Amino acid sequence: LNVHIAAEMVTISLDSSGESLHKRGYRTANTEAPINEALAAGMLLLAGWHGQANFFDPMCGSGTLLIEAALIAQNIAPGIFRKGFGFEKWLDFDKDLFEMVYNDDSREREFTHHIYGSDASFYAVQVAQKNIKSAGMQRFIDVKQIRLEEIRFAGVEGAPKTEGAFVMMNPPYGERLAQDKDVLRLYEDMGKTLKFRFTGATAWIISSNEEAMKCIGLKPAEKMHLLNGELDCLFNKYELFQGEHKDWKKTHPRSEQRTKDKEQRTKRFGDKKREFRPRRDDDKRGFKTREKKDFAPRREKRDFKPKSNYKRPRNNESYTDSRL
């Protein structure tokens, strides 16, 4: 029971949740500064993830993104692993009804693809594996210890398919790294790995370090602003392809629609790239100039100068005195 008093207003409420709902209940171990479970799920939904392809997280940490991706892919309720809720202690709590709802898995779906995670830290991989086991997702998630620059997927025989896959990363933001150069170099390696090892995939990266995000070297297809705790973060989308961006745009499924949109904009607003040249004397205009018309002469201006030596009286002078 919560009571909140503000001036003459008193609010009485019942806590139906108990522990914060962002705590799913599957975490048995943590790495340093793991991402919030609710934020991870929100990022996946914003990216359009519903289990329609393979999923990769090359910096998986404690495995939060991997587990949330598996839950969404199978449409499993996020609070299924919680030990309890606050409303279970209410006097009118219906235990039978709650058990019926809790055990209802009729809306869950089959996940036919796979989820892959990796991290350079052996400890992080161990933590991720424990959490994955706690969530019962070992069948759908594989985690290995491997450095970012050593990842090999695209073009490797027998490797997981990256075409149409989702890649999502929550890299270090720079607060815990010793030097700024280390951060910039890390983000440069991320860009190279995404470009050459995840060809055909769509990548999403969240970070509060805008300067480091520029070092990725890829043009964002989309940008969003999210809050990770108190940090204002960029959440960028990258379309990964071979060759140059202009060539990829021509073969992209939306290229025809983009061409139509451009034609409509040009038709409506004109071509901003059209050439302008100075007008010459011999140029002929395609319109008639305005004909000159004879207008009546303007009336003479009024002359406000005094026509006599008449002056207004000042101070204690009278009208008679002022005329003298």
Give each language-model segment a name:
Residues 1-26:
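Non-catalytic substrate-recognition/targeting regions of SAM-dependent transferases
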Residues 3, 58, 62, 171:
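Conserved beta-strand/loop positions that form the S-adenosyl-L-methionine
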Residues 25-35:
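Class I SAM-dependent methyltransferase Rossmann-like catalytic core
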Residues 35-153, 182:
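Conserved S-adenosyl-L-methionine
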Residues 146-258, 269, 273:
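C-terminal catalytic and target-recognition region of SAM-dependent MTase-like enzymes
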Residues 157-161, 196, 230, 237-324:
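Basic Arg/Gly/Lys-rich low-complexity intrinsically disordered segments
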